[in-house]
Amino acid sequence: MKITFSPELSIPCEVCKNQSNGYHFEVLSCGACASFFRRSVVSKIKYQCKDGKKRCQIRYLDRHFCRYCRFSKCVKAGMKAEKIQKNRDLDSSPTPTDQNNCIPSDVLHDDGILIKDIRGLFKQFNPHNASEGCSKLEKLTEGLQFIRRNQERECIKIIDEMDSESLKDVQFKVIGSCATWLLFSSFFQKLEENEKVVILERLWHGWTVLEFLSRSLEIFGNKVIDEKIVFISDNTAIRLITAFENSLKTASPKKSESIKKKLELSFSVIFDELALHFINWKPTEIEISYMQWQIVWSVAEQLLSGNSLEKGEHFTEQLSKDLHEYYVRELKLENYAFRIEKMMDIVQIVQNNFY
């Protein structure tokens, strides 16, 4: 008998063994357990074990969980309460810090200023070209194709240095690309402007790593790892480590050493971990879009609440169903657990290092 695995069933929830739909609070889990954990932390609920032994089995097939043991299992699995924004003031939400930026703030321009310049895009851009009748995941993939539509594949300029103004221009363009891609999500389109802005502000660093790296590996292959080359625009790539070493020549020895230490860790993650995962697997555009949304949701679920949070959970669950249909109907795969595991590995590396 032929057996197919949905993306959720191939990797079960670490709490209740139900269908997982991505990482929540750093644990691969289902939406129900993630919501339960969030409610418990925000409401500061103190549970009592149903039978007093504190060893109850947590299985999704059971109608009534022991809430004490379910919460304990969430914590034991690795869910972190500090990942929950208990007072969700979106307008005053802090920007990402050096600890989780792929490039330190010593090097980057103020992304808050750049994002304010992009606010108008949320009002003006409407991805009307998204095909009618296609799935939500296919629409996100159309968005990926849209922001890559002018990608050069032959006449590529490779540079070894970049001045401050050029870096600012790259930042502005990539934040714009991230915002544009997000608008291919029907869920994101309907969010309030302040919700969109704060998600974009928190998101773009890690999103950029995955976008630039996947695009670069598709065209350059192993040269990305060997020469540390990545695209920074449609027709320009940069030898990343060489360029930053050159840019630090005029800095004071103390500042130069400080920035180098911060960059070395990020570059190691990008080239020694993420790039190798891609090279050994070669994901499709559909899979890249799915991974990007998993990263989006890991940020957004910490910031949203109420109706927005609920709709986002439904949208994310639908993407998992769309991915299953893609594997079964398009790729004709009987067992795609390997591909799901690869995607989740990449998503977790980005989450752990850039957020």
UniProtKB/Swiss-Prot annotation:
Keywords tagged on the record: DNA-binding, Metal-binding, Nucleus, Receptor, Transcription, Transcription regulation, Zinc, Zinc-finger
SMART domains per the UniProt record, alphabetical: HOLI, ZnF_C4
InterPro entries in UniProt: C.elegans_Orphan_NR, HNF4-like_DBD, NHR-like_dom_sf, Nucl_hrmn_rcpt_lig-bd, Znf_hrmn_rcpt, Znf_NHR/GATA
Zinc finger (NR C4-type): 13-33, 49-69
Cellular compartments annotated: Nucleus
Record has Ribonucleoprotein as a keyword: no
Expression triggers: Transcription up-regulated in response to intestinal colonization by probiotic Lactobacillus fermentum strain JDFM216.
GO MF annotations in UniProt: DNA-binding transcription factor activity; RNA polymerase II cis-regulatory region sequence-specific DNA binding; zinc ion binding
Gene Ontology cellular-component terms listed: nucleus
Coiled coil, from the record: none
Top-level taxon of the source organism: Eukaryota
DNA-binding span(s): 10-86
Domain NR LBD: 126-355
Task performed by this protein: Orphan nuclear receptor. May play a role in modulation of lifespan and immunity.
Family stated for the protein in its record: Belongs to the nuclear hormone receptor family.
Record protein name field: Nuclear hormone receptor family member nhr-127
Organism the protein comes from: Caenorhabditis elegans
